[in-house]
Amino acid sequence: MKKVQKALLVLLRAGLWESRIEDLSCFPMSAGEWKNLYLLSRQQTVTGIVFQGIQYLPEHFLPAEELLVRWMAETDAIERKNMQMNKALELLVQWFTESGVQPVLQKGQGIASLYENPLLRECGDIDFYFDSRQMFEKAFSLIRQCGLRGKVQADQSVTYAWKGVEVEHHTCLLDLHNPFLQRYAKELEQQYGYNHMSLEGGQDVRIPSPVLNLLLQSLHILKHALGWGIGLRQLCDMARSCYKLHDEVESEEMKKIILKLGMDRWQQLLHAFLVEHLGLPVAYLPYQEIASDSSPLLDIIWRGGNFGLYVPGHQRKSQSLLAGKWQTACAFQRNIRFAFRYAPKEGFWVFSSLLKGQLK
């Protein structure tokens, strides 16, 4: 691992757990190395958490004041965007609730609440799941009545902008593409159900129960790891979720579910990464089985950054739909060995769905 990458992980662990820095061997760093570390933290969308980690560095190891001021301004922008997101989420949930629609908040601000300082986690969009087709259609009808332009995506999700924030509506809670496991996924949803969390203004919103929450994130990370790539932010989310939800998850049950989904090798790899690189104590894993080597996942993370946006050739908006599908297919092909080593069945069906244009 390169010096800058190692230093990033050291500072990330300190910021993620708000604890002292355990390894100072990477420091001091040159101005050029600090600049690269800053850019890498932005690529991985962990700028605010790494800045928090810098607070634990001895003064003589700190970067130049000019970069610190720039980093501070970027962190302040992240906090302000989170506050905007929280207000938009509150208003949208309130409107849906008053209209008889009960969304389930996926990831996002629900996961942010598990951080020591939620405002430092970089937010993306608002993801809602609707547990019936009727509820999904009612929500879609409501946004159209308000003049919002909802766009139907290839995977049948709906996207639109609400008060400056991108919102997505989903018909599936778990990113599971194996058709032979869809019934089991629904059974899990019915068995474990949902919890409630209070938003800042006091409005309640449904969130996945701890078991579903951990499964949702694991599958989400896997899907993106198989394609363009995944970033450190999503792995930090998983680490914080394991830590905060540990007492609400029964390890033998979780292991049984993972085995039935055929994800045991993947889960062991994920566990190894969380422990080795993000500092999650082994005792807080959903169950204590760990791969001997986490480097295959680490390689994917360094290669692509946040959802693979920094992979050479990755374009958010391709010149054509066909070109976009081709690019995504090529991205998956690069990870084909990874897929069939760690999640062969799910990897096969993710690729099949991708070819049919069912993935974003």
Which ranges hold each PLM region?
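Conserved NTP-donor binding/palm subdomain of two-metal-ion nucleotidyltransferases/polymerases, i.e.
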Residues: 1-124, 130-360
